Each structure stands twice: as C-alpha cells, then as structure tokens.
Amino acid sequence: MARLGQLHNYHLLFKSQAVCPYLSHLNQASKILDCGVGTGAFSLALLESVAQSAHVSGVDISYPMLTQAQQTLKNRCTSLDLRCGDIRRLPFADESFDAVIFAHVLEHMAEPVETLREMSRVLKPGAPLIGSVTRKSLGQVLMSLHWHNRGYTSNQLASFLQATGLEAVNSFDYGTGWSRWMCLAAVGVKSR
C-alpha cells in the first residue's frame, strides 16, 4: 500500500475528526493490535499521527509481510510482537488491547462479521476498532481480478461492525485522490 501512496491517506485517517477522538487515550503503555499487519504501514501511520509509541502486536498470514513489518516498525514501538497466524483465531486473551486496527484485510475474509467478532473479543471495554476496506466500485471490480478481494458499501461496513455488538459505529470515506473513491473506513467502540 505504501507504493500506492496509502501511507499519506492512512495519516489523514488517523488525524481525522472521525477517528482521532477515539485514540486520545493512547500512550507508550498502550497495547495496539494490527490484524493483517502486512508491511506495517497502517500501524506506522497510527504511531506517527497519534500515539508516537506504543506496544504493537501484529498478525499476518504471510511471513514475507511480517518481515517487511519488522523493518517498518522495529524502531517505532515501545515493543513489537509480530506473529504469523490467522486473524480469525487470534492468539491473544480476551480484552487484551487498547485499540485494534486493520487495513484491507476484511475484503479477503469469507465471513467478515465473524472476523470482526474475533477482533472485538481482544478489545478492552471502551476501546476502538478502526479499519479500512476497499469500497464497492468499478475500480474494486478491476482490482478483484488480481487480488480476489470484495468491496463493501458504507452501509455494509457499518452493519458488520454493529453485528459484532460494537457501539458508536461510524463508516466514512477518507483520504485524497484515488483513495477517496476506493477506500472506506469505520470505527466502533466495544461496550463497557
């Protein structure tokens, strides 16, 4: 995604009025989980935009992506814990994280609501789940020929988060340029 200029758009997302208030509690002692961490760009944008430093855990199914994430994040975190695994079965205890984030991974899941439920399981009460997905569009259809991903509407994304029991759900577009037409973001908070 960094090659596509997404890092700048990720910064805009975390600094936006729709997301920033949910992250004001983060500090160096906070624990953040990035599901489908990939290259680490989404976590890096969060750290650079809001948290400065935190304990970051990341799960990805790809060892090469974890290697890239290690390079991206190694000097940016209070601590870094990267694990190869399936985000549908997270290797963490219930209510472990102060924030859970994900970028462009939900589109690859056959059961998006079940995947989000698993992410919500590891959130502490009152903590946010923040994610980015590909918007359902002609561009997404063309992308799916290469990446085999789904696209979602804003209403679909919001309904997925609501189905997990998250509160204060908001779904919106973000970024500049092509990202504004291709990406959606959502935020929800685990009930206390």
Question: For each of these PLM feature ranges, what is it?
Answer:
Residues H104-V105:
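Short catalytic micro-motifs in class I SAM-dependent methyltransferases
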Residues A127-V133:
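Conserved beta-strand signature within the Rossmann-like core of class I S-adenosyl-L-methionine
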